[in-house]
């Protein structure tokens, strides 16, 4: 699925990504000399709110090893950004114990569906079971009232 590219917004994401990698002490520049690398990083830190300069900095100074990783990170960020605009594509996350996740994954494979679809199915089955149990209980009560 294609998503519209927003140059200014994505330049900000790229800047954030590069600074994060730099703080994690990864080599983000193509420079071998540490003084050149440090100067390039200092110039990156000063151009946060200047998208065109960020793009120029990337073209001139970024390590080739980071190129694919940056593209993948931006593609994922772009997808999350556009999916968050609509309720039905917005993703939510939940924390599950490993054993619960394992059982859910097993049930998903049995049903041949996604984890989300499996959760939805199990909830609807649970609701149906509650409804049937309540109906049976009501019938038993009515029957016992009639017999008394």
From Swiss-Prot:
<dbReference type="GO" id="GO:0043565">
    <property type="term" value="F:sequence-specific DNA binding"/>
</dbReference>
<dbReference type="GO" id="GO:0051301">
    <property type="term" value="P:cell division"/>
</dbReference>
<dbReference type="InterPro" id="IPR009390">
    <property type="entry name" value="MatP"/>
</dbReference>
<keyword id="KW-0131">Cell cycle</keyword>
<dbReference type="InterPro" id="IPR013321">
    <property type="entry name" value="Arc_rbn_hlx_hlx"/>
</dbReference>
<dbReference type="Pfam" id="PF06303">
    <property type="entry name" value="MatP"/>
</dbReference>
<comment type="subunit">
    <text>Homodimer.</text>
</comment>
<dbReference type="GO" id="GO:0005737">
    <property type="term" value="C:cytoplasm"/>
</dbReference>
<comment type="function">
    <text>Required for spatial organization of the terminus region of the chromosome (Ter macrodomain) during the cell cycle. Prevents early segregation of duplicated Ter macrodomains during cell division. Binds specifically to matS, which is a 13 bp signature motif repeated within the Ter macrodomain.</text>
</comment>
<comment type="similarity">
    <text>Belongs to the MatP family.</text>
</comment>
<dbReference type="InterPro" id="IPR038339">
    <property type="entry name" value="MatP_N_sf"/>
</dbReference>
<dbReference type="InterPro" id="IPR035087">
    <property type="entry name" value="MatP_N"/>
</dbReference>
<protein>
    <recommendedName>
        <fullName>Macrodomain Ter protein</fullName>
    </recommendedName>
</protein>
<keyword id="KW-0238">DNA-binding</keyword>
<keyword id="KW-0132">Cell division</keyword>
<keyword id="KW-0963">Cytoplasm</keyword>
<dbReference type="Pfam" id="PF17414">
    <property type="entry name" value="MatP_C"/>
</dbReference>
<dbReference type="GO" id="GO:0006355">
    <property type="term" value="P:regulation of DNA-templated transcription"/>
</dbReference>
<dbReference type="InterPro" id="IPR035375">
    <property type="entry name" value="MatP_C"/>
</dbReference>
């Amino acid at each position: 699925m294609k998503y519209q590219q927003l140059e200014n917004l994505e330049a900000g994401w790229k800047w954030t990504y590069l600074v994060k990698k730099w703080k994690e002490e990864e080599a983000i520049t193509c420079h071998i000399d540490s003084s050149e690398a440090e100067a390039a990083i200092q110039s990156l830190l000063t151009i946060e709110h200047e998208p065109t300069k960020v793009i120029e900095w990337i073209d001139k100074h970024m390590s080739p090893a980071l190129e694919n990783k940056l593209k993948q990170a931006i593609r994922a960020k772009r997808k999350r950004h556009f999916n968050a605009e609509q309720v039905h594509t917005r993703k939510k996350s939940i924390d599950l114990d490993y054993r619960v996740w394992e059982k859910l994954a097993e049930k998903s494979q049995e049903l041949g569906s996604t984890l989300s679809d499996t959760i939805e199915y199990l909830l609807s089955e649970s609701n149906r079971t509650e409804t049937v149990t309540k109906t049976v209980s009501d019938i038993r009560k009515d029957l016992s009232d009639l017999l008394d």
